[in-house]
């Protein structure tokens, strides 16, 4: 067996050389995989004979079985979008009114996939996708096959690095030519190709497809004093950093840079879809903070989207989970931004009236934010005798009278028994960010509703195997899996349930903030809007919406029924202890700690109720300083901020 292991190792390494370096494989993938699996089985049986150069011990030789979920220690926020000079000016005015000394760093917005790289003692431990910003997927083995990502840093740092993985235009062209030759469907664009590559289970394919990265953020280290310095430090650590950026305090300069980049973007070897403008000084970033969704110190200017002409054939009106009735145009198919588009949103009735959009019109279609197809304008020169579009007065689902509130642009169905509203609400409740009930998608929801088995979310927890087997197309194995997923959802932390209820203005992050503060859903029956508005990151509108919902008798009954069904109503995450010694204090870590690493120190401070930030400002209450503390310690002393050492922290 030892001889066979040596033979297989040599043979597979030869094939790896042909595949990766020479790009001229002499055997098929299936033949390689067959030999590889034989080697794996032998090594599992005779582990003492595993050779150091075995391809099973090398990055690039792994056949993965799937991807595990990964919870980010630090959330990855999205960015506020801007589509005009006016929106950039408004951003500038908001920043400069509070911080006249603010500078901006404008960076290219790479059209790729957000990734997070976690290093412990300088070793790459985790590579993950962004996901929903809180939970992504662990794609570490694939990340290790991206050549420009360091597997080991020159310093033994505990740090999280963020950036974009992308596919160059050249690599994209090559892969599509290969797929065409092999009779495989071509990728629509480099971003799709990069996304498909990162989700490959065969890491050899990832290695061959030549993904690359640009990194732009570090989290968990003693912060640099600016975003520009962060980029320089990342480059020093061996990461790929995009050199196309501009530092200026003038939004006029930033706008000129954006215009210049837009005019020459096709000359770049990779695709971009805009420019990100960030406040350069990290101390100002710290003071500006975040909304529930995005940092207040950054904005993403998106280049105007590609536009195409198409004819509106018909219009569908659909009811969403909040009762909003949305018009969608059915179009003659057009190729747009690498995909075939045959439907586009018309937004709402006010938009239709403003643009005077009619069935039969030739319209200009674009992808809003390069994602959602939308109708931009009518091509008046091609209009003949089209008549104004009839606007529905009755709900397309339940036929009840639609309303158009003065302060809203949309038509709304207010019938709580509307079939579409109920079904969309149930789909939302079961969605991944909410209760995450796998198998309870639109098709199954429609069957359950049509059979009279579900009318609200509590009915989900009354379903039996017999109920599900009554439905057309539902087999016993699928039914058992769905019931298991429903049972598993009962144990979710309560913020997922709160989000799943679909209360207006209450998103996933707001749900978490609310439950972190109040602990369980039943407590929300007695809170006031003013109390809720005091939570950092929320506001009075969210508070009023939540209170209005929980003042209804139906809400009390709903919680009682869910509780009776065994659904957890409590927040299971770590809550700030209001009695904790450091509750409510803003704390900065600086210098080298001897007994704790940076992550452990941060976790201990947070357990004691502190908010740990990266830079010293007037809002800082306390600085914990280790040895070799530098500018942060000096600034804290200058501002008269309380300073403690590591031993003090250990003794708490």
Swiss-Prot record:
Known cofactor(s): Mg(2+); Mn(2+)
GO term, biological process aspect, one: DNA replication
Residue span, BRCT domain: 577-652
Any one GO molecular-function label of the UniProt entry: DNA ligase (NAD+) activity
Domain of life: Bacteria
E.C. code: 6.5.1.2
Cellular component per GO, a single term: cytosol
Alphabetic keyword roster: DNA damage, DNA repair, DNA replication, Ligase, Magnesium, Manganese, Metal-binding, NAD, Zinc
Residues that, per the record, bind NAD(+): 29-33, 78-79, 107, 130, 164, 278, 302
Reactions that this protein is recorded to catalyse: NAD(+) + (deoxyribonucleotide)n-3'-hydroxyl + 5'-phospho-(deoxyribonucleotide)m = (deoxyribonucleotide)n+m + AMP + beta-nicotinamide D-nucleotide
InterPro entries attached to this UniProt entry: BRCT_dom, BRCT_dom_sf, DisA/LigA_HHH, DNA_ligase, DNA_ligase_AS, DNA_ligase_CS, DNAligase_adenylation, DNAligase_N
Top-level EC class: ligase
Gene3D superfamilies: 5' to 3' exonuclease, C-terminal subdomain (1.10.150.20), 6.20.10.30, BRCT domain (3.40.50.10190), DNA ligase/mRNA capping enzyme (3.30.470.30), Helix hairpin bin (1.10.287.610), Nucleic acid-binding proteins (2.40.50.140)
Function: DNA ligase that catalyzes the formation of phosphodiester linkages between 5'-phosphoryl and 3'-hydroxyl groups in double-stranded DNA using NAD as a coenzyme and as the energy source for the reaction. It is essential for DNA replication and repair of damaged DNA.
Family: Belongs to the NAD-dependent DNA ligase family. LigA subfamily.
Protein name, entry field: DNA ligase
Gene from which this protein is expressed: ligA
């Amino acid at each position: 067996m030892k001889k066979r292991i040596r033979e297989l190792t040599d043979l597979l390494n030869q094939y790896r050389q042909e595949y990766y370096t020479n790009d001229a494989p002499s055997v098929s993938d299936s033949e390689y995989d067959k030999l590889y699996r034989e080697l794996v089985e032998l090594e599992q049986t005779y582990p003492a004979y595993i050779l150091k150069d075995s391809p099973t011990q090398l990055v690039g030789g792994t056949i993965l079985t799937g991807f595990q979920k990964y919870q980010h220690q630090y959330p990855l926020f999205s960015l506020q979008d801007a589509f005009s000079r006016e929106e950039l000016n408004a951003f500038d005015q908001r920043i400069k009114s509070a911080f006249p000394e603010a500078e901006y760093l404008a960076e290219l917005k790479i059209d790729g996939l957000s990734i997070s790289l976690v290093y412990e003692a300088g070793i790459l431990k985790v590579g993950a996708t962004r996901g929903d910003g809180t939970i992504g997927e662990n794609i570490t083995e694939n990340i290790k096959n991206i050549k420009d990502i360091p597997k080991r840093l020159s310093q033994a740092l505990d740090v999280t690095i963020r950036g974009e993985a992308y596919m160059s235009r050249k690599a994209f062209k090559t892969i599509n030519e290969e797929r065409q030759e092999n009779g495989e469907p071509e990728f629509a664009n480099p971003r799709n190709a990069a996304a498909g590559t990162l989700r490959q289970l065969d890491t050899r394919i990832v290695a061959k497809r030549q993904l690359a990265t640009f990194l732009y953020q570090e989290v968990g280290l003693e912060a640099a004093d600016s975003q520009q310095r962060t980029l320089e430090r990342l480059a020093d650590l061996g990461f790929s950093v995009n050199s196309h950026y501009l530092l200026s305090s003038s939004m006029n300069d930033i706008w000129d840079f954006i215009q210049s980049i837009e005019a020459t973007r096709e000359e770049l070897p990779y695709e971009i879809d805009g420019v990100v403008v960030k406040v350069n000084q990290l101390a100002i970033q710290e003071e500006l903070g975040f909304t529930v969704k995005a940092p207040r110190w950054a904005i993403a200017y998106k280049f105007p989207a590609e536009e195409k002409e198409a004819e509106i054939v018909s219009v569908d009106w659909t009811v969403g989970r909040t009762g909003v009735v949305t018009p969608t145009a059915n179009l003659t198919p057009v190729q747009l931004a690498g995909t075939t588009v045959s439907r586009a949103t018309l937004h709402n009735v006010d938009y239709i009236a403003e643009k005077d959009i009619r069935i039969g019109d030739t319209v200009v279609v674009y992808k809003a934010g390069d994602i959602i197809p939308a109708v931009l304008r009518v091509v008046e020169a091609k209009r003949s005798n089209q008549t104004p579009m009839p606007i529905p007065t009755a709900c397309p689902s339940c036929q009840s009278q639609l309303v158009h509130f003065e302060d809203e642009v949309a038509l709304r169905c207010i019938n709580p028994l509307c079939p579409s509203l109920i079904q969309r609400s149930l789909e939302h409740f079961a969605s991944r960010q909410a209760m995450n009930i796998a198998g309870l998608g639109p098709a199954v929801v429609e069957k359950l509703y049509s059979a009279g088995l579900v009318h609200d979310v509590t009915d989900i927890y009354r379903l039996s195997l017999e109920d599900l087997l009554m439905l057309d197309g539902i087999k016993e194995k699928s039914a058992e899996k769905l019931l298991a997923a429903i049972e598993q959802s009962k144990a979710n932390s309560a913020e997922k349930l709160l989000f799943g209820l679909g209360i207006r203005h209450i998103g996933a992050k707001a749900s978490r903030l609310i439950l972190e503060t109040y602990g369980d859903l039943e407590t929300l029956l007695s809170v006031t809007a003013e109390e809720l508005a005091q939570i950092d990151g929320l506001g009075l509108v969210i508070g009023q919406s939540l209170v209005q919902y929980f003042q209804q008798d139906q809400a009390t009954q709903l919680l009682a029924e869910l509780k009776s069904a065994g659904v957890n109503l409590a927040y299971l995450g770590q809550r700030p202890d209001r009695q904790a010694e450091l509750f409510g204090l803003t704390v900065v870590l600086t210098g080298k700690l001897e007994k704790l690493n940076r992550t452990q120190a941060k976790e201990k401070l947070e357990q004691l109720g502190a908010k740990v930030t990266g830079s010293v400002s007037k809002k800082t209450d306390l600085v914990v300083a280790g040895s070799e503390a530098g500018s942060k310690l000096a600034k804290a002393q200058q501002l008269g901020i309380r300073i403690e050492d590591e031993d003090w922290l250990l003794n708490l």
